[in-house]
Amino acid sequence: MKKPTKLRLEHLVKLDPLTDNQQLAFNSFASGNHLCLDGSAGTGKTFISLYLALESVFKKEYDKVIIVRSAVPTRDMGFLPGTQEEKEDAYTAPYKAIVNDLFDDYGGWTKLIEDRKIEFLTTSFIRGITLKKSIVIIDESQNCNYHELCSVITRLGEDCRFIMAGDYYQSDFTRKGDQDGISQFIKIIKNMREFDHIEFKWEDIVRSSFVRDFIMTKEMLERGKID
């Protein structure tokens, strides 16, 4: 079947929650709250975030989705070789795959970029921007330091939604100050009425049973629960 040249809401593959916490994320988003999705890999945090955000954009509730990431480990894409687009490819690949799956269209990501319904930024390039009528997703947020997280959230202008997705056991930071900064930011948003913090557990891992077993064993070792 020929794929559409312009994507619409009816082209978005219907996604149903697979676990109680996924359902909680759906319900919380529908209530109008900002989200902090925290937990293990394979629980669908990024997939859900993009689905909910794109559905809202195609319902014309917002103009576009903006995906934000910290450029770890360089923290500045200027250190990477190639053009700006080539530099971004290293970071956008997971989102391209998800978007293409959500629309069952290999060219889905490109079509949304061309239609200005989705945009990718790093924290290095967000300063000085005021974001309006957008859903902002900070993915891999465990790799943003306190200053970066504050910089992003204070960019939000009128009619914006904010979604954080990360696994705070798996930060790339080695400095205690950076780790403490993430904890401080989480404390702030937990005390905001407009935020819902949803913690995904091992039972929420839906990628595969093998991945679930691996992550459970890995995290139990890291936490000293097994030898």
Give a label for each model feature.
Residues K2-I138, Q142-D227:
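Conserved helicase motor core of SF1/SF2 NTP-dependent helicases
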